[in-house]
């Protein structure tokens, strides 16, 4: 601390005092105010009232109290990113969640996987510096489609599957300079926030900008009083490559962090994020674009335009969009040039909406089930009810978004009334969808009527058949790709786990794979510990899966106790016969004593 040209080292004096009192304050640390008061008392005694120590502590206490905790268990930095994922693998994942949009899923899976695999290839072969800035064209993507067709949903799924940070912004909220709305570079800073401050991880993230058609500078669009072309120009550098400063002059937190960094190191450090590997995906409905495409096709006299005109469908025209159409729509050529990949989403019809609701991975139905489960009520839907809900949603002309309001309108009364009753289950049938108020009234008047239970069991059985069919299809795909076989018992176990709300189908298979690794680990551990080899047969694995998924038995603890309990019996057989390899069956899992007793009796019966 500088005082009139001299340097007073408080730390050395405080260290001696701290050592002397270590026994008294071992478990008690002074808070900020106490520390500030003690230091000021010391300075006052030493130099009088001429010197005061002011400590500005604007950081929330909670932030200071945070430890490493569970964060140590999470993959750090880029290690969590799946750089080597193949397009077909990602497309298969999307097929389980996203209905229709075959072409969009194919293009997105291919180009996004290529983007990250190219990054991996360049870095593994140390080519980043060699070709830095030379011929680097990112697979930035433009998605065209109406509201409610799954544009945002599909990008969120991809980001989650790949393990990359993801942020979404609205193009209408940004301006060229930041005077109105936000600065486009704020999206890059938000990406660092989503990456928990990990700049390296953020540099491989995905930035998704919706409503991009609203910044087209064409006269037929009415928007906020800002320069739309200016916003386009502001996006040019981030979409290609630039360095974005994390600290901005008007941000007090950034200023505070810079001061603290300078206080600690005596150096001014500028934290920047390079956008070279950040993937930009933009989307919009682009109403009116089909007219531009139609004029171009007609002027060119393309042979298939007659067929398109007969369909009178804007989405047929959008399939033929070109860069020149987007430029005429109001985008600058430099902006369009940074979006080399164009994807057109299909509109959703009634059957598509029905398939969305029917899909066990549907967030709409699963979310509503969780809402009722929070009150201890088990909610099930009949297939006919899902069809009626889809028909109602289609009338709203808002795509999949209409499904949410359709379900809410039907079930709102039940969600309000049933938590105050003893009702523990509800079947959403065609009858309920047609007359929700009447059905609710009859249920409240006679909740113990066997009719309600019969309807619930019917819905549950329908759902079980649908889920089992989808789990079996997924299992067949595993067999085809990996050679792994699944018994009917294991398929039924996974289906029941999904039905009970334990996980969606992909997650259930991930957990099964993890469980199988745990089983093999304990087999190896038993050999290392006791010099005896044990192997669980397929029936035993099925039974362990049932215990883990349906009976909620912790598998690690269960397997450790099971094998330790089996060791004396197996050791006895080994000592008598020399046998050192054993096959454990489902009986060993359920009744290890009976299993070992039978093995010992079989041994003595031979002699």
Please identify what each model-predicted range represents.
Residues 2-607:
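Non-catalytic accessory segments flanking P-loop/AAA+ NTPase cores
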């Amino acid at each position: 601390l500088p005082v009139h040209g001299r340097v007073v080292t408080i730390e050395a004096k405080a260290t001696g005092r701290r050592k002397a009192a270590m026994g008294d304050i071992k478990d008690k640390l002074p808070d900020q105010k106490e520390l500030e008061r003690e230091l000021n008392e010391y300075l006052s005694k030493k130099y009088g009232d001429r010197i005061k120590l002011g400590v500005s502590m604007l950081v929330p206490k909670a932030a200071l109290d945070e430890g490493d905790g569970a964060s140590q268990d999470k993959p750090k930095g880029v290690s969590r990113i799946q750089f080597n994922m193949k397009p077909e693998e990602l497309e298969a994942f999307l097929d389980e969640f996203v209905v229709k949009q075959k072409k969009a899923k194919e293009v997105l899976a291919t180009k996004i996987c290529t983007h990250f695999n190219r990054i991996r290839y360049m870095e593994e072969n140390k080519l980043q510096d060699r070709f830095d800035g030379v011929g680097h064209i990112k697979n930035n993507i433009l998605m065209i489609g109406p509201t409610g067709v799954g544009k945002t949903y599909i990008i969120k799924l991809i980001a989650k599957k790949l393990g990359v940070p993801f942020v979404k912004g609205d193009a209408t909220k940004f301006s060229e300079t930041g005077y109105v709305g936000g600065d486009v570079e704020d999206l890059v800073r938000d990406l660092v926030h989503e990456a928990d401050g990990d700049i390296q991880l953020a540099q491989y993230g995905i930035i998704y900008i919706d409503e991009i058609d609203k910044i087209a500078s064409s006269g037929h669009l009415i928007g906020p009083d800002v320069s739309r072309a200016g916003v386009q120009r502001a996006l040019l550098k981030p979409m290609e490559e630039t360095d974005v400063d994390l600290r901005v002059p008007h941000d007090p937190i950034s200023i505070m962090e810079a001061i603290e960094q300078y206080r600690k190191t005596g150096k001014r450090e500028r934290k920047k994020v390079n956008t070279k590997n950040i993937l930009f995906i933009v989307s919009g409905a682009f109403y009116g674009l089909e007219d531009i495409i139609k004029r171009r096709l007609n002027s060119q006299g393309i042979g298939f335009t007659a067929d398109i005109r007969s369909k009178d469908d804007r989405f047929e025209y959008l399939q033929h969009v070109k860069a020149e159409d987007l430029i005429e729509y109001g985008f600058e050529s430099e902006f369009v040039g940074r979006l080399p990949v164009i994807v057109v989403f299909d509109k959703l019809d009634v059957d598509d909406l029905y398939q969305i609701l029917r899909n066990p991975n549907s967030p709409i139905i699963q979310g509503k089930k969780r809402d009722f489960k929070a009150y201890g009520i088990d909610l099930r839907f009949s297939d006919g009810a899902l069809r009626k809900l889809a028909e109602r949603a289609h009338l709203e002309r808002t795509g999949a978004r209409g499904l949410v309001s359709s379900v809410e309108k039907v079930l709102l009364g039940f969600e309000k009334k049933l938590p105050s009753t003893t009702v523990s289950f509800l079947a959403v049938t065609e009858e309920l969808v047609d007359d929700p108020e009447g059905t609710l009234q009859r249920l409240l008047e006679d909740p113990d009527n066997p009719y309600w239970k019969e309807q619930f069991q019917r819905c549950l059985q329908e759902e079980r058949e649908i889920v089992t069919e989808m789990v079996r299809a997924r299992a067949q795909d595993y067999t085809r790709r990996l050679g792994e076989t699944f018994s009917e018992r294991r398929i039924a176990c996974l289906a029941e786990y999904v039905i009970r709300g334990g996980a969606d189908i992909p997650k259930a298979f991930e957990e099964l794979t993890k469980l199988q690794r745990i089983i093999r680990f304990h087999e190896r551990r038993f050999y290392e510990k006791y010099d005896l080899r044990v192997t669980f047969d397929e029936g035993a694995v099925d039974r362990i899966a049932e215990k883990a998924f349906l009976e909620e038995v912790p598998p690690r603890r269960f397997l450790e106790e099971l094998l330790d309990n089996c060791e004396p019996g197996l050791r006895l057989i080994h000592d008598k016969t020399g046998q050192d390899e054993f096959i454990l069956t489902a009986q060993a899992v359920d009744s290890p004593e009976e299993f070992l007793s039978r093995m010992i009796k079989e041994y003595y019966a031979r002699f």
